[in-house]
Amino acid sequence: MSHVELQPGFDFQQAGKEVLAIERECLAELDQYINQNFTLACEKMFWCKGKVVVMGMGKSGHIGRKMAATFASTGTPSFFVHPGEAAHGDLGMVTPQDVVIAISNSGESSEITALIPVLKRLHIPLICITGRPESSMARAADVHLCVKVAKEACPLGLAPTSSTTATLVMGDALAVALLKARGFTAEDFALSHPGGALGRKLLLRVNDIMHTGDEIPHVKKTASLRDALLEVTRKNLGMTVICDDNMMIEGIFTDGDLRRVFDMGVDVRQLSIADVMTPGGIRVRPGILAVEALNLMQSRHITSVMVADGDHLLGVLHMHDLLRAGVV
């Protein structure tokens, strides 16, 4: 395209709003196609013993990739196969236990229609999503989902806009309906998203990130305050646990306790840790979620917490550990 000048006063915002208005109308019309065929499609996908295989060419292929990704992350195992590659060997990835979803707005994609006889021969259920109920793909499908739109948002009527939005929304409707039918939970979602923020919050446990062994700051009850302070600075967690030879907790001493000692105006050189420690102390179990420990620490306004089985010290968790793990 040759260079053109921007028309004086051209309103980009108005052009954008017109697109939204057109696509809103098209989505409102889509409601009529959530019908018995939609139920049949969901049932085939729900009872599928294999995977949901999504196919599409061009823009429909891009929508198909997103659709497959949404299915896979919401409890419906799925993957995308390019129809052109399927015709040259990749169809071997599809089994009779699978369900195929084929996408084409015209319903006449030659790359897909060429595959239909093979899919039929293998008795693979075929769900077609098209904008034309009378198309070849719609007629060949076991279930046809219509995504017909009145007009594209593109003023030329050429670039797939409203039609791709309608197809994407139909895919979301399938995915969420199946999610609800399966009783899919946030914890299930986290299992397929371990690297995401939600995954870290719902999967990471205290014992995954707590300090253990030699990293635990601890002294005996007979230690001087000076020795306890040295332990605090060596382990750099802003606290030390007071425990016996069997790592049974007797108390805790934090940097906040140290400030209170100085406010007392006493000679710190003459004090033992037993004189100034806080008996007992807040502790959490090692198996709880890290986000639960975070909530406790925030509610109690503390930056570190003991990890214990009853009174038996197992580790220490600091707010910095939660930050590094991405829980905060």
UniProtKB/Swiss-Prot annotation:
Binding sites annotated in the UniProt record for Zn(2+): 82
Reaction catalysed by this enzyme: D-arabinose 5-phosphate = D-ribulose 5-phosphate
GO annotation terms (biological process): lipopolysaccharide biosynthetic process
Matches recorded under Gene3D superfamilies: CBS-domain, Glucose-6-phosphate isomerase like protein, domain 1
Domain SIS, residue spans: 42-184
Pfam families listed in its UniProt record: CBS, SIS
Domain CBS: 210-268, 277-328
Keyword Protein transport: no
The protein's enzyme class: isomerase
Enzyme Commission number(s) of this protein: 5.3.1.13
Site (Catalytically relevant): 59, 111, 152, 193
One Gene Ontology MF term: carbohydrate derivative binding
UniProt keyword annotation of Oxidoreductase present: no
Chain positions recorded as substrate binding sites: 75-76, 82, 88, 114-123, 148-150, 222, 275
Annotated family: Belongs to the SIS family. GutQ/KpsF subfamily.
Function: Involved in the biosynthesis of 3-deoxy-D-manno-octulosonate (KDO), a unique 8-carbon sugar component of lipopolysaccharides (LPSs). Catalyzes the reversible aldol-ketol isomerization between D-ribulose 5-phosphate (Ru5P) and D-arabinose 5-phosphate (A5P).
Official protein name in the record: Arabinose 5-phosphate isomerase KdsD
